[in-house]
Amino acid sequence: KFDGRAYEGLIEGKAALGWAGGAVLAGNLELKHMNSTRLLAALGSDLLTEGELSARLKLDAKADRLDSLVEALRVGGGFEIKRGAARGFDLIEAARSSGRAVARGGETKFEQLTGVIQYGQQESRLGDLRLTSGLLTAGGNLGIARDGKLSGAMNVELKSSAAVVRMPLAIGGTAKAPQ
């Protein structure tokens, strides 16, 4: 069992390491109020987000040798980022352009972004994504390959006093340059 402070937030967890036909790791991890920009940078992620991250995660790994556990690590669970921004793409501008052109650059500010992460060595998946920001709501999923390539889709809804615009958007490009 462990707890501490990291990236302007708190981390708590419990893990067990065993040897049953190889090295086995199982545990739970809770992150509270962490700086998502600093945490993702420390993990080597190219995703450009900012905001206050909280998550409840399960960890597991099984390998023939102890020194191979990190390569076999799988992480999954729910997360929430509050008062943040996703940099590199602007969902509002992409929805307004109605898919006529590939949207690049900008940022999407949000009050809340929630979802489920499944991390593996070959690919990570962000599912059940739900983003809210005033009159903007979006939901979808995103895959991030080991080489940083993105694949996914978002359904974006923009409300105004006169109309509601709904737009399905495909996500591609890379984590450094989404489109």
PLM region spans:
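Small-residue helix/turn framework positions
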Residues: 1-178
